[in-house]
Curated annotation (Swiss-Prot):
GO terms for molecular function: 2-C-methyl-D-erythritol 4-phosphate cytidylyltransferase activity. Pathway: Isoprenoid biosynthesis; isopentenyl diphosphate biosynthesis via DXP pathway; isopentenyl diphosphate from 1-deoxy-D-xylulose 5-phosphate: step 2/6. This is 2-C-methyl-D-erythritol 4-phosphate cytidylyltransferase. The record marks R152, K205 as: Positions MEP for the nucleophilic attack. Coiled coil: none annotated. It comes from Cereibacter sphaeroides (strain ATCC 17029 / ATH 2.4.9). SUPFAM superfamilies: Nucleotide-diphospho-sugar transferases. Disulfide bonds: none annotated.
């Protein structure tokens, strides 16, 4: 089956510190996005890779490995995350794509096994996404004080890549009014079943300065350093 990967990197978030959005900040000597793109370009069965960017980031994007050679295609994002994803989905229309992976550009440590088992889950469901069960105690707070606890049974921390049968998620995005937190929300609004796949604690989204330090350590371990 033909599979495309959509890497969403059009956001402008700067919670990680510095002047650049987190996906463009350096990690182990390369932009975060360079690590993310490398993971999907090496993934078995992925025939096309689309990178969704903010228009202001085009020059940076063109310098990434794979872009100049045409192995990574650039798509300009929209005013929101779901609009950005839809732009990429529309760019694939008529290309014979059967499955699509949608991934946060700021998750550079996604493993080949996670990509493979997320795609495999599409054999029995139109959508699939990795998640990690919530293990910490959950509190409800008000005015800086704990006012109650929350049962964590059945609660998960969502991750990406989120995988879908292409035509199903394209139709879901076309029908959605916007404002979704992720593509699972878009899919469920269209009545699509989404399978939960075992996620990975190392598949972190680099958002704060401490996340970069942890990601650096994990990359060093993976490299045997």
């Amino acid at each position: 089956m033909t599979t495309a990967a959509i890497i969403v990197a059009a956001g402008r978030g700067t919670r990680a510190g510095g002047d650049l959005p987190k996906q463009w900040q350096p990690l182990a000597g390369r932009p975060v996005l360079a690590h993310t793109l490398a993971a999907f370009r090496a993934a078995a069965g992925v025939s096309r890779t689309l990178l969704v960017i903010h228009p202001d980031d085009r020059a940076r994007a063109e310098a990434l490995p794979g872009v100049a050679e045409g192995k990574v295609e650039l798509v300009e994002g929209g005013a929101s995350r779901d609009a950005s994803v839809r732009n990429a989905l529309e760019a694939l229309a008529g290309a014979g794509i059967e499955r699509v992976l949608i991934h946060d550009g700021a998750r550079p440590l996604v493993a080949p096994g996670l990509i493979a088992r997320t795609l495999a889950a599409l054999e029995t469901a139109p959508g699939a996404a990795p998640a990690v069960p919530v293990s910490d105690a959950l509190w409800r707070g008000e005015g800086g004080r704990v006012v109650g606890t929350q049962d964590r049974t059945g609660l998960f921390r969502a991750q990406t890549p989120q995988a879908f049968r292409y035509e199903a998620i394209l139709a879901a995005h076309r029908a959605h009014p916007g404002g979704a937190a992720d593509d699972v929300e878009v899919a469920r609004a269209a009545g699509l079943e989404v399978a939960i796949v075992e996620g990975c604690e190392d598949n972190l989204k680099v958002t704060y300065p401490g996340d970069f330090a942890r990601a650096e350590r994990l990359l060093a371990l993976a490299a045997g350093l």
